[in-house]
Amino acid sequence: VNGVKIYFDGAMGSRGAYLLEPYSDDLNNIGLTITNENQIRKKVKIFNDAGFQVAIHCIGDKANRIALNIFEEIDSKSSRNRIEHAQIIHNEDINRFYELGVIPSMQAIHCTSDMYWIDERLGPKRIDQSYPWQSLLKSGSIIPGGSDAPVESPDPLLGVYAAITRKDLDGWPIGGWLPNERMTIDQAISSITEWSAYSMFSEEFYGKIHKGYLADFTVLNNNLSQIEPKHIPEVKVLYTFVNGVIVYQHDK
């Protein structure tokens, strides 16, 4: 066991994400906290001192800011502490992730699930703070990707598609939702390979096909870098290798 997860706030859909300002569609509500701020501060200190990485569930911009403040106070970059989801980040806090060595662990597919209604929750002035992947990457951060299954599909290719298009499977919206924050295909692939390995202290064993690394990899029927993004969800896994052994083979 490398780390522990602490829940700070709720979800955006239920208006439970902890915000700096009230919800645009619920002016008396700024969300909620599941774990008390002082309890989180104590737990982070205890777990980091014991050698554990801490991942804090934060969706709203206030939750993210407070978590960053706590990590700054603890000052434990070597722990590679993470913020899980990091969906809504105030513009003033973008650079702090890299500066503090805090890893934003994000799930691209959440963006394309939430984009239909999130403008109602946040309003036009805050909407550009939603899933700011490219802003984080340009500041120096890495973004390990995931699916948050069973909340979303565990298929990593759907996550890659969401990351580089910010569209749903029907191609909506044209041009992508907040397209300036899309990842490149190379960034999206790194997100589910080498960056994820780094985020779990396994970058010397996983995340690359390279001499000395474990032979854990997949073989696809197409090159993700050479096909149109709209075709990525159609790509099939032909083989899955674990420690050099075929554990899955697609039926011909």
Label each region the model flagged.
Residues 16, 250-252:
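Short linear motifs in exposed loops
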Residues 1-53, 94:
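Active-site-adjacent helix-turn-beta-strand microarchitecture at beta-sheet edges
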Residues 44-55, 62-81, 85-86, 91-98, ...:
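His/Asp/Glu-enriched, well-ordered alpha-helical/loop segment
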Residues 232-234:
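C-terminal accessory subdomain/extension
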